């Protein structure tokens, strides 16, 4: 029998029956019981969501014009803009979408890592070097570089040691995500959930859909922020918070335009 209805005759459960669904249990001919995991189908999003569907928010609002036919508003962050036609091919679009989401996450972590040590240093926490693009040079100092300032964790005086640690730390997480977790239970490697969602933020489908939009929007801002940090480091040789403090102290002489004019030929 593929499914069975078992009447429980104990005194505490008299008169009650438990039905084992074929999707959750099977009784084979040799008496073994096999269990299968059932996946609950997500509820469809409400048609009133401003971020999805044909009536979603567009990149120029009411002046956006008609979106390309392949941008249907199915995915978060789709504002109907693809001038270069990068999303026309479904396979290319899927690949680029994954690349964007992953780069968004690294950029958000990177932007936090660029600002937070400098913020702590300005509030009395001692660092060997708090400015993000100067921190790596500590491996060439006499004392080397200690992870988290603790010499008992990783004491590095070699670029290869730093590289190896990054490969292990970053590669392990990415490998875990792409492989679908330790048991291969992850359905969507872009939004794996499970161990990656300990707070259960993805349990409600509508709230999760909105979080995806916030996630991609903040990630795009973070990528622009990282680009700005790179340019600031090259032009001013200072960290982002120091540049901000200089601008607030003297906005007339410390701004993008004043630095750009320094590169005018003949000046």
Curated annotation (Swiss-Prot):
Any one of the GO CC terms: chloroplast thylakoid membrane
UniProt remark on cofactor binding: Binds at least 14 chlorophylls (8 Chl-a and 6 Chl-b) and carotenoids such as lutein and neoxanthin.
Organelle transit peptide: 1-35
GO molecular function, one term: chlorophyll binding
Binding site residues for chlorophyll b 1: 59
Family in the record: Belongs to the light-harvesting chlorophyll a/b-binding (LHC) protein family.
List of residues binding chlorophyll a 5: 214, 232
Protein name: Chlorophyll a-b binding protein 50, chloroplastic
Modified positions (Phosphothreonine) in chain numbering: 38
Keywords in alphabetical order: Acetylation, Chlorophyll, Chloroplast, Chromophore, Magnesium, Membrane, Metal-binding, Phosphoprotein, Photosynthesis, Photosystem I, Photosystem II, Plastid, Thylakoid, Transit peptide, Transmembrane, Transmembrane helix
